[in-house]
Amino acid sequence: MLPPAIHLSLIPLLCILMRNCLAFKNDATEILYSHVVKPVPAHPSSNSTLNQARNGGRHFSSTGLDRNSRVQVGCRELRSTKYISDGQCTSISPLKELVCAGECLPLPVLPNWIGGGYGTKYWSRRSSQEWRCVNDKTRTQRIQLQCQDGSTRTYKITVVTACKCKRYTRQHNESSHNFESVSPAKPAQHHRERKRASKSSKHSLS
């Protein structure tokens, strides 16, 4: 058994050792938890972000689709060059006019389209109504005709200068003529029947 003086000298040593142990445990726990990384909740990647990355950052909104469904439409204009003749007389210079024919098509499809046009309308693909190209503007032009006898004639003709798209429905194709109701004709009495009736009456009297 140790003397009391040794016990007193061991107490401070035990206290120092206990402090060091606590400090070691605290340091270890702090070091341990410092390396723990909290799990970050993974955000589900939406289809829009994937499409944006694949398409080079382009956004496709619903408004863009709506605009594509309704596009401007215009006529397919044709230029015609012809000579006017009347009997033995023919025009000296050819006549250039505009022919409005064919269907109405979206403007980007039409040839020589530069981003606009006269007489454009909005055309919907879902619409059951049909658009047709018709004459819009005309002007009167004088043209001279040269005859074989050396004389000249001057004529006034109408030339088309602009076309437009006109909407036609099924009712336009149906005939709009109102037929007048014909009253039923009264049965005409023949003269022979009258004569027979008169003869029968005479025989009955006799």
Curated annotation (Swiss-Prot):
<dbReference type="InterPro" id="IPR008835">
    <property type="entry name" value="Sclerostin/SOSTDC1"/>
</dbReference>
<keyword id="KW-0964">Secreted</keyword>
<dbReference type="GO" id="GO:0031069">
    <property type="term" value="P:hair follicle morphogenesis"/>
</dbReference>
<dbReference type="InterPro" id="IPR006207">
    <property type="entry name" value="Cys_knot_C"/>
</dbReference>
<feature type="region of interest" description="Disordered">
    <location>
        <begin position="176"/>
        <end position="206"/>
    </location>
</feature>
<feature type="disulfide bond">
    <location>
        <begin position="104"/>
        <end position="165"/>
    </location>
</feature>
<dbReference type="GO" id="GO:0010454">
    <property type="term" value="P:negative regulation of cell fate commitment"/>
</dbReference>
<dbReference type="GO" id="GO:0042475">
    <property type="term" value="P:odontogenesis of dentin-containing tooth"/>
</dbReference>
<dbReference type="InterPro" id="IPR029034">
    <property type="entry name" value="Cystine-knot_cytokine"/>
</dbReference>
<feature type="disulfide bond">
    <location>
        <begin position="100"/>
        <end position="163"/>
    </location>
</feature>
<feature type="disulfide bond">
    <location>
        <begin position="75"/>
        <end position="133"/>
    </location>
</feature>
<feature type="glycosylation site" description="N-linked (GlcNAc...) asparagine">
    <location>
        <position position="47"/>
    </location>
</feature>
<feature type="compositionally biased region" description="Basic residues">
    <location>
        <begin position="188"/>
        <end position="206"/>
    </location>
</feature>
<dbReference type="GO" id="GO:0030514">
    <property type="term" value="P:negative regulation of BMP signaling pathway"/>
</dbReference>
<feature type="domain" description="CTCK">
    <location>
        <begin position="75"/>
        <end position="170"/>
    </location>
</feature>
<dbReference type="GO" id="GO:0090090">
    <property type="term" value="P:negative regulation of canonical Wnt signaling pathway"/>
</dbReference>
<feature type="compositionally biased region" description="Polar residues">
    <location>
        <begin position="44"/>
        <end position="62"/>
    </location>
</feature>
<dbReference type="GO" id="GO:0005615">
    <property type="term" value="C:extracellular space"/>
</dbReference>
<dbReference type="GO" id="GO:0007389">
    <property type="term" value="P:pattern specification process"/>
</dbReference>
<feature type="region of interest" description="Disordered">
    <location>
        <begin position="42"/>
        <end position="62"/>
    </location>
</feature>
<feature type="signal peptide">
    <location>
        <begin position="1"/>
        <end position="23"/>
    </location>
</feature>
<dbReference type="GO" id="GO:0030509">
    <property type="term" value="P:BMP signaling pathway"/>
</dbReference>
<dbReference type="GO" id="GO:0060648">
    <property type="term" value="P:mammary gland bud morphogenesis"/>
</dbReference>
<keyword id="KW-0879">Wnt signaling pathway</keyword>
<dbReference type="GO" id="GO:0060070">
    <property type="term" value="P:canonical Wnt signaling pathway"/>
</dbReference>
<dbReference type="GO" id="GO:0045165">
    <property type="term" value="P:cell fate commitment"/>
</dbReference>
<keyword id="KW-0325">Glycoprotein</keyword>
<dbReference type="GO" id="GO:0045662">
    <property type="term" value="P:negative regulation of myoblast differentiation"/>
</dbReference>
<protein>
    <recommendedName>
        <fullName>Sclerostin domain-containing protein 1</fullName>
    </recommendedName>
</protein>
<keyword id="KW-0732">Signal</keyword>
<dbReference type="GO" id="GO:0072148">
    <property type="term" value="P:epithelial cell fate commitment"/>
</dbReference>
<dbReference type="GO" id="GO:2000016">
    <property type="term" value="P:negative regulation of determination of dorsal identity"/>
</dbReference>
<dbReference type="Pfam" id="PF05463">
    <property type="entry name" value="Sclerostin"/>
</dbReference>
<dbReference type="GO" id="GO:0098821">
    <property type="term" value="F:BMP receptor activity"/>
</dbReference>
<comment type="function">
    <text>May be involved in the onset of endometrial receptivity for implantation/sensitization for the decidual cell reaction. Enhances Wnt signaling and inhibits TGF-beta signaling. Directly antagonizes activity of BMP2, BMP4, BMP6 and BMP7 in a dose-dependent manner.</text>
</comment>
<keyword id="KW-1015">Disulfide bond</keyword>
<comment type="similarity">
    <text>Belongs to the sclerostin family.</text>
</comment>
<feature type="glycosylation site" description="N-linked (GlcNAc...) asparagine">
    <location>
        <position position="173"/>
    </location>
</feature>
<dbReference type="GO" id="GO:0036122">
    <property type="term" value="F:BMP binding"/>
</dbReference>
<comment type="subunit">
    <text>Interacts with BMP2, BMP4, BMP6 and BMP7 with high affinity.</text>
</comment>
<feature type="disulfide bond">
    <location>
        <begin position="89"/>
        <end position="147"/>
    </location>
</feature>
